[in-house]
Amino acid sequence: SVMCSSFAVDGDEITQIRRLLTEVYPHQSFSMVSDSYDYWHLVKEILPQIKDEILEHDGCLMIRGDSGDPVQVVTQTVFRLWEIFGGTTNSKGYKVLNPHIKAIYGDSITPQRCESIYSILEQYGFAINNVALGVGSFSMQCLETMKAGATEYSPYTRDTFGIAVKATYAEGKNGEPIMIFKNPKTDIGHFKKSQRGCCRVFKTEDGYGYQDGLTWAEAQQDNELQTVFKDGKFTKVFRLDEVRKNLHGGT
């Protein structure tokens, strides 16, 4: 999330949102991942503070949740945005948010969840075009199973296996270390919390352990991590049998 690196520098999220609205995308609609730290704080507390900037923006700001229960997050977001920004009523009598704001969820949307979201919005008198729904790795990589006569979907994504690639470290103009991390409060499965700063992996009696929160120089000492991809090129290629040996302690 772009919010993580900005938070590490600015100490808040509102500065970056203003920058996105007025400098980066002043004449375009864009979606903004909003759950890097505290999604509902951003929706309920930060958005009202920049209401004028959002309404003056030449485009639509789409508030994107990316953790928690998608059905609850999407529908509750629409309700909160209506309280803050208001809107109009269409010809069928359904509420439509101000065109400068909308809710979006880019992943974890199955057909069943989509139907649930639309059903709840209709129940509370909101038009379904208040939300945008996407299809991503969750939707494409779920295994469908039957349990107790009902269909269940088991996700197998990068978050399931903890292999998502996230930036965790940067340096300022004067070389000062900047620790980047994300820790969404809405992440009920604890899949998305990232390490902070540079990391060191070391061998233990049980396998491997790690230490984070390090500077670049500190992470170079006794580190089992090896660079395999840098500046668009492979620097080292591991065979599958090598990966298995590392994983299982050389056996």
Language-model features, listed with the residues they occupy:
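An anionic, glycine-rich sequence signature occurring as long contiguous blocks
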Residues: E152-E205
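Short helix/loop capping segments that flank catalytic or ligand/cofactor-binding pockets
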Residues: H41-V43, L143-E144, V237-F238
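Buried, small/hydrophobic-residue-enriched core segments of structured protein domains
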Residues: S1-S91, I109-S116
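C-terminal active-site-proximal or functional interface alpha/beta core segments in diverse enzymes
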Residues: L61, D66-G175
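Short acidic (Asp/Glu) and glycine-rich catalytic loops that position anionic groups and cofactors
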Residues: E56-C60, Y94-N98, L225-F229
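Domain-wide signal for the mature, well-folded portions of proteins, strongly enriched
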Residues: Y25-S31, E53-L55, G93, A170-G172, ...
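Extended hydrophobic packing segments that form well-structured cores
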Residues: N183-T251
